[in-house]
Amino acid sequence: MYAIIATGGKQYKVSEGDIITIEKLGVEAGEKVTFDQVLVVGGDDLKVGDPTVAGATVEASVVKEGRAKKVIVYKYKRKTGYHKKNGHRQAFTQVKIEKING
């Protein structure tokens, strides 16, 4: 059985036991989270939402929170001496999918 969930402005295809990296939720490691925006529940019978499947949820537990590797942004304009260096680390949450209800 699989499901497609929407969280953090993105969509993820998940199955039970999967560990996925999503946008930061602000939840402690070990806590449970429930995703209510389930777009599709697949398996023996396919349920497609309009836009979400009524009554379907996905339960997960938080594995860890962290920050991704640093991405360097370097702006440069020739002949003017202008250059600017900037770094960014995106915060993320890793969750393990425990159960798909739907």
From Swiss-Prot:
Pfam families: Ribosomal_L21p (PF00829)
Molecular functions (GO terms): rRNA binding; structural constituent of ribosome
Function of the protein: This protein binds to 23S rRNA in the presence of protein L20.
Organism: Agathobacter rectalis (strain ATCC 33656 / DSM 3377 / JCM 17463 / KCTC 5835 / VPI 0990)
Gene name per UniProt: rplU
Subunit structure: Part of the 50S ribosomal subunit. Contacts protein L20.
One GO process term, biological-process aspect: translation
Name under which the protein is recorded: Large ribosomal subunit protein bL21
Keywords in alphabetical order: Ribonucleoprotein, Ribosomal protein, RNA-binding, rRNA-binding
Cellular component terms per the entry's GO annotation: cytoplasm; ribonucleoprotein complex; ribosome
Similarity comment text for this entry: Belongs to the bacterial ribosomal protein bL21 family.
Ribosomal protein among keywords: yes
Organism ancestry: Bacteria, Bacillati, Bacillota, Clostridia, Lachnospirales
Origin superkingdom: Bacteria
